[in-house]
């Protein structure tokens, strides 16, 4: 039954910085093209936004508040028919420290 299905690697990338994320996506797609794997993506997923509300004053003034937000940008890349060379190339990629990578087979 597994022979009827195509082998697929799904790479999910997360980052606070969208430019780092785009550069990482380009590196992964170039590595896949060099090893003759079919790359689909990057597919942008909705950006998650967390907002934190903090009182400005340490004492009174409940009306004076400050809002901070963290945006998490996400992308998905699917690789179809990867070879062992593709997997070796992907493991040797040097991605920036601000990018979280999750790989599913």
UniProtKB/Swiss-Prot annotation:
InterPro entries: Ribosomal_uS10 (IPR001848), Ribosomal_uS10_CS (IPR018268), Ribosomal_uS10_dom (IPR027486), Ribosomal_uS10_dom_sf (IPR036838). One of its GO terms (biological process) is translation. Pfam families: Ribosomal_S10. Gene3D superfamilies: Ribosomal protein S10 domain. SUPFAM superfamilies: Ribosomal protein S10 (SSF54999). It is found in: Plastid, Cyanelle. Keywords: Cyanelle, Plastid, Ribonucleoprotein, Ribosomal protein. The keyword Transmembrane helix does not apply. One of its GO terms (cellular component) is ribosome. One of its GO terms (molecular function) is structural constituent of ribosome. Involved in the binding of tRNA to the ribosomes. PANTHER family: 30S RIBOSOMAL PROTEIN S10 FAMILY MEMBER. Part of the 30S ribosomal subunit. Belongs to the universal ribosomal protein uS10 family. This is Small ribosomal subunit protein uS10c.
